[in-house]
Amino acid sequence: MANYISSVLKSLLLLLHLVFLIQQHVDSASIVKFLPGFEGSLPFELETGYIGIGEEEEVQLFYYFIKSERNPKEDPLLLWLSGGPGCSSISGLLFENGPLAMKLDVYNGTLPSLVPTTYSWTKTSSMIFLDQPVGTGFSYSRTQQYNKPSDSGEAKRIHEFLQKWLSKHQEFSSNPFYVAGDSYSGMVVPATVQEISKGNYQCCSPPINLQGYVLGNPITEHAIDYNYRIPFAHGMALISDELYESLKRVCKGEYVDPRDTECLKLVEEFSKCTKGVCQEVVIKPLCVTETPNCYIYRYLLTTYWVNDVNVRKALQINKESIGEWVRCYFGIPYTHDIKSSVPYHMNNSINGYRSLIYSGDHDLNVPFLATQAWVRSLNYSIIDNWRPWMIKDQIGGYTKTYANKMTFATVRGGGHTAEYKPYETYIMFHRWINGQPL
């Protein structure tokens, strides 16, 4: 009898614990109709919230969810991951492909303003902007007892996040689903796609309607990404013919951690030539955030805006989450355990998922030449050969389509992220997501 009572009590306690967790989930999502700095009510549907990850839900991942402005019942659902690792997804929302942007006014001590954009991907898709890994943006841990984030570990956490998010938003469970991101998320997105794909064939959880993924200037493999900086720099007239020929002859195409002393000297010469160049987009001036006439001044304005007490209140930020918000926390504890994401791309292709891989063609960090090289290494036949894609009568970039449902495209004049050419990138994405040729 005592054992029976004990068993019943345990069951009741477990039930109460589950009810408590469900209640926490319900309370953690909020509809946001007004944002400080934006005049009037928001012209789109915004939800913010936290999803608990792990057995004890010790990790709390923060997200911004914006419904498609076209037909949310049928339009695709995209998960957006910013790079870093450690860069808040606000980087995507306010700089790259969201419906709001910072107004570039000189900061005068008052709250910076927000303005609507004309290039939001939410015009045709619903989007979840996720702060990950833990410690990024407004995502935090309730305790110190959690696994240190890693590339492969994040793929599992993101998959868990999606399962829980979709269980709360079942009206989107049948929508075509895509994972998207840029920069360092090139290591995490392909692994996440594979993790979701595997999960769809396992028991106990409803399948996610995974259709494919989108990556911009993705970090893929350090040696490939770095080695192609030298030919890219030469093509952009950043180094001389003589230095380029010497580098090729002496280093034989391997420029990462050279052991040959002559090669090392030449690589150092290359570094001197490119030190004063803006790595993210070589045609922009190298400048500091605090300069009002500089493009990245918006990063400073965003920091002032996000750290305003009324903005945090509107976004329903848990007070226990973090102290000062930073756009990119580059010192985040993290294990880089995926050395190359190429095998993940291969597996995802074999499983039939669509992909759009695009490159701003003026990025020195991850040159388009590097991305082209690993795409070429997949050895798929070409369906649509290299050609310009147009916006009205202007060239938006160049594109090539492969038999594995992979489309590669450049964005002419673009940089390391979509923020440098947001309208052109939007046109490219809009066509691809709707199944149209670029």
Swiss-Prot record:
It is found in: Secreted. Its main location: secreted. The keyword Signal applies. InterPro entries: AB_hydrolase_fold (IPR029058), Peptidase_S10 (IPR001563). GO terms for biological process: proteolysis. Expressed in seedlings, roots, and siliques. It comes from the Eukaryota. The keyword Transmembrane does not apply. Residues 1-28 form the signal peptide. GO terms for molecular function: serine-type carboxypeptidase activity. Its EC number is 3.4.16.-. One of its GO terms (cellular component) is extracellular region. The active site is at S183, D363, H416. Disulfide bonds join C87-C328, C251-C263, C287-C294. Pfam families: Peptidase_S10. SUPFAM superfamilies: alpha/beta-Hydrolases. Glycans are attached at N108, N347, N379. Keywords: Carboxypeptidase, Disulfide bond, Glycoprotein, Hydrolase, Protease, Secreted, Signal. Belongs to the peptidase S10 family. Probable carboxypeptidase. This is Serine carboxypeptidase-like 5. It comes from Arabidopsis thaliana (Mouse-ear cress). The gene is SCPL5.
